[in-house]
A protein has these predicted regions:
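Short, well-ordered, aromatic-rich surface patches in folded extracellular/luminal domains
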Residues: 11-62, 124-192
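Hydrophobic H-region at the start of alpha-helical membrane spans
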Residues: 2-10
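Short, surface-exposed linear patches
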Residues: 77, 95, 119-121, 162-165
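Long, charged/polar, surface-exposed segments that mediate recognition or autoinhibition
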Residues: 90-122
Length: 192
């Protein structure tokens, strides 16, 4: 009996050691959902061939018929802008442009300079649309292959910042907007 108890204790110790080691590995690789901004930032340019970045901007909470949002997605091969109507994101207009790896790498480096992957703590408890319902809201995403590895939001009202996105919002928005020579024409009639 003593041998069985010692064997069970030894197995338990090994199992706990494996779990702790696995948790540390996941945290270091960012697989546990708590990726540090340093880990994500280093991956922006390093994984340019297999990634895309996206910004989604929407108007405050208003009638479905007047609710518009803009989504811009950039990858090594394409740049896409979509104007979406209503809360169900019905596509009204879109434009797809080609891209190349060097242009995309330059874009990612510019995003890094503007803290695209910076994460800030938001203890407000609000969600994306609830924090500042009459103001513009932003979502920033990084996709690696088919996996979304970074998704943070931001809004500002009453002198307060809300959301987990810690980057430079206006500069980042301008960088995305400048990827589309026809931005003004595509978004004509969309009021924020």
């Amino acid at each position: 009996i003593a041998a069985v108890i010692i064997l069970l204790i030894a197995l338990l110790v090994v199992a706990i050691g494996v779990k702790v080691s696995s948790d540390r590995r996941a945290r270091n690789l960012g697989l546990d959902g708590t990726k540090s901004s340093e880990v994500i930032a280093s991956k922006l340019v390093d994984n340019a061939e297999n990634s895309s970045v996206r910004i989604y901007v929407e108007r405050g909470v208003i009638a479905d018929e007047k609710h518009y949002s803009i989504e811009m997605t950039i990858s090594a091969n394409t740049r896409t802008i979509r104007v979406l109507r209503g809360y169900e994101n019905i596509e009204e207009k879109s434009e797809g442009l080609s891209n190349n790896l060097e242009a995309y790498r330059a874009f990612l480096k510019a995003l890094e300079k503007n803290d695209f992957t910076e994460i800030r703590e938001d203890t407000s408890g609000f969600e994306f649309r609830a924090a500042c319902p009459t103001e513009r809201s932003y979502r920033f995403s990084l996709m690696e292959g088919s996996s979304e590895t970074f998704d943070r939001w931001f809004t500002f009202c009453d002198g307060k910042r809300f959301g987990e996105y810690g980057g430079k919002v206006n500069a980042t928005f301008s960088l995305f907007k400048n990827q589309f020579p026809n931005y003004g024409m595509i978004t004509r009639g969309v009021s924020f």
